[in-house]
Amino acid sequence: MSRLGIMVLTLLLLVFIVTSHQDAGEKQATQRDAINFRWRRSLIRRTATEECEEYCEDEEKTCCGLEDGEPVCATTCLG
């Protein structure tokens, strides 16, 4: 094989290695963003649940969750 052929193959191999490395980095960043989103979402949900529990505690009832952003309190939660 000529020198030019070897150089072209080497260049193609380098391009392949660089692009696959970039793809792996982007995938890792996407996974990290997804984990951060889940963590923030659970934190928001936990805060809302705590507020609901405090609100219903004043009425001596159980917090059954939020409906349209408002706490739903009842003596017994169904479903």
UniProtKB/Swiss-Prot annotation:
InterPro entries: Conotoxin. This is Conotoxin PnMSGL-03. Keywords: Amidation, Cleavage on pair of basic residues, Disulfide bond, Knottin, Neurotoxin, Secreted, Signal, Toxin. One of its GO terms (cellular component) is extracellular region. Disulfide bonds join 52-64, 56-73, 63-77. It comes from Conus pennaceus. The modification Leucine amide is found at residue 78. It comes from the Eukaryota. Belongs to the conotoxin O3 superfamily. Residues 1-20 form the signal peptide. Residues 21-44 form a propeptide. Its main location: secreted.
